[in-house]
Amino acid sequence: MSESQQYDVAIVGAGPVGLACAIEAGRQNLSHIVVEKGSLVNSLIGYPTNMEFFSTPELLEIGGYPLVSSRYKPLREETIDYYHRVARTENLNIHLSEKVLRLEGKRGQFTLYTDKKSIQTRNVIVATGFFDQPNLLNVEGENLDHVHHYFKEAYAYSGRDVVVVGAKNSAAKAALLLNRQGANVTMLIRG
């Protein structure tokens, strides 16, 4: 269950930030390993199917590779394809479907324990993002089967009453998409 190689850096998370860190580690001739509990850019896969990013392509680029988009703001699918191409081009040492269980050690000498092995490393970068941690309201009923903390598609809600909590870009975009599909949308906004 142990890897004999000592890495200069272990990166937890294979999202855009984790990939960018791995690219830079490779360019600095640092031995590295990326450990991801899901798939490559796992959080982006959970985004709504036809989502358009609020950022321009330049703000999503990593490693100096251009993100070419057919639009001013890239679509989810274009962005996922882009990160997969960059990871293949850079031949990054990525271990998918491997969950980190714990980290032990001290500066310069860490052991990262996963559900498959233990990894010796001098440095650790935690690039896990925040998508897996929704902002729960801690209100009665939020754990019911029909309550969702992530928006994927609007089609299933056509002709139904839907409440969207929040007022930031993602909430507003979800409300618009739901409305266009015929849902009766109510937005709950703090303040």
Model-derived features: where do they sit?
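Short beta-strands and strand-loop turn motifs
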Residues: 63, 97, 186-190
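Glycine-rich active-site loop/strand segments that organize a redox cofactor
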Residues: 31, 45-80
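A short linear boundary/processing microfeature
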Residues: 50, 142, 180-181
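Short glycine-enriched loops at secondary-structure junctions
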Residues: 49-51, 131, 169
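Rossmann-like dinucleotide/flavin-binding elements
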Residues: 2-7, 11-37, 150-191
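Short beta-to-alpha loop/turn elements within the nucleotide-binding domains of ABC transporters
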Residues: 38, 57, 98
